[in-house]
């Protein structure tokens, strides 16, 4: 069974990746194991701000961000009758994606790119570029 890490952030690009993924799954003979991941950058410790936030308010913030990032992707997967295991992490986005792919023994990483403008090498997304360099499994980037 194919084991896939599907990475989302709630953006239009990540929703396009989920829609593309759903189309790919329809062509498969066997339903893959799907790990749906969203990663948040840590709240910076600017001027003692992180110390001023309680663990409860920080947890609430990350939960709200997670719910927002996952909402559309979960709806698209549910509509396509694709089950998934949800993961929400805090940390460096690219290294967290690669770490979780390894931990879950994923066969591939599936994710969207950022806008591809005139400076596509820079804008493709430092996250997408870093994942490509760090990953030991195939990475599917959907534009």
Enumerate the language-model features and the residues they cover.
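General small-molecule cofactor/ligand-binding pocket signal
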Residues: 35-37, 85-89, 140
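Phosphate- and divalent-cation-binding pockets in alpha/beta enzyme and binding domains
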Residues: 16, 96, 118
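A short acidic, glycine-rich active-site loop
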Residues: 54-68
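Class I S-adenosyl-L-methionine
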Residues: 22, 71-78
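Small/aliphatic-rich secondary-structure junction motif
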Residues: 2-53, 82
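Gly/Ser-rich helix-loop-strand patches that form or flank binding pockets
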Residues: 3, 99-143
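Structural beta-alpha unit
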Residues: 75-109
């Amino acid at each position: 069974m194919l084991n896939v890490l599907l990475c989302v952030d709630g953006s239009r690009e990540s929703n396009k990746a989920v829609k593309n993924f759903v189309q790919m799954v329809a062509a498969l003979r066997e339903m893959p194991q799907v790990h749906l991941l969203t990663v948040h950058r840590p709240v910076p410790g600017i001027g003692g701000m992180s110390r001023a936030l309680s663990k409860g308010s920080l947890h609430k913030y990350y939960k709200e961000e997670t719910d927002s990032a996952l909402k559309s992707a979960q709806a698209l997967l549910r509509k396509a009758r694709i089950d998934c295991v949800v993961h929400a992490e805090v940390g460096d986005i690219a290294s967290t994606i690669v770490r979780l792919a390894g931990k879950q023994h994923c066969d591939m990483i599936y994710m969207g790119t950022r806008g591809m403008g005139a400076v596509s090498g820079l804008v493709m997304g430092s996250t997408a570029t870093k994942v490509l360099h760090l990953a030991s499994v195939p990475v599917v980037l959907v534009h």
